[in-house]
Regions:
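Generic detector of contiguous secondary-structure segments
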Residues: 1-3, 166
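Generic alpha-helical scaffold signal
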Residues: 4, 8, 39-42, 204
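Catalytic-core regions built around general acid/base machinery
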Residues: 7-17, 78-85, 139-143, 173-177
Length: 223
């Protein structure tokens, strides 16, 4: 992968656009056809950690393939095969829930962490996907406070992404729970709205809204 990606160019383009930090590098889910197939894919996923290191990102984020009868077995085997390949890398893997994927519910994370104890593997919270799936996200945070490495901040009406502060999700509650566990990671805004032409304005409004929420909960503005 590092042969195919011009990392220096990506960094320069990000700087030209005014971006100052890369909070995560996103990668493909492990294949789920068989345990052997997932294990064989570990080497390619390990390359993501080198890309992330060069990008200055602390995290690699992946989700799961669509839910099938094969269950989480192949994905867990793939992660286990990945860990020895990244043991000298300080970066961490933060598993994100996706609506309809095999990583979605509280029980999915429970099954993963029953077999994988490494602190190098944790959770990306995603308020939108949790809302779509009806997940008890507070219980997940309470169960795994030290494994919460990342937060994708979304607001939704039903399964549809909407601008932050205009939907049904208790984002204030998320900030309260994260503050209570001492979370210091990213608040990564995601907007998958039906009117993408308005994204520049929605991003500006999201920044103001999030700063307000953080100030309201913690008493100080975030950096």
């Amino acid at each position: 992968m590092t042969r195919w990606v011009n990392i220096d160019l990506m960094i320069q383009c990000a700087r030209d656009a005014g971006l100052e930090q890369c909070t995560e590098v996103y990668g493909a889910a492990f294949p789920t056809g068989s345990v052997a197939e997932a294990q064989a894919a570990a080497g390619f996923r390990a390359q993501l950690f080198e890309v992330a290191r060069q990008m200055g990102s602390p995290l690699v984020v992946i989700t799961g393939r669509p839910r099938t009868d094969t269950g989480l077995g192949p994905t867990i085997a793939g992660i286990k095969a990945l860990l020895p390949l990244i043991e000298n890398n300080p970066l961490r893997l933060a598993l994100e829930p996706h609506f309809g994927s095999q990583i979605q519910f509280f029980e999915d994370y429970e099954a993963i962490f029953e077999q994988i104890e490494s602190p190098q593997v944790g959770i990306t919270l995603d308020s939108g996907h949790f809302h779509s799936a009806g997940v008890d996200w507070k219980s997940l945070i309470h169960r795994y406070p030290k494994r919460i490495y990342n937060f994708h901040v979304k607001d939704h009406i039903g399964t549809q992404s909407v601008p932050l502060g205009t939907g049904e999700i208790d984002l204030h509650g998320y900030i309260e729970e994260l503050h209570a566990i001492g979370y210091e990671g990213a608040l990564a805004v995601e907007l998958e709205v039906v009117d993408p032409e308005n994204l520049p304005r929605y991003c500006e409004e999201a920044f103001v809204y999030l700063r307000y929420l953080v100030k309201n909960v913690t008493g100080t503005f975030p950096d």
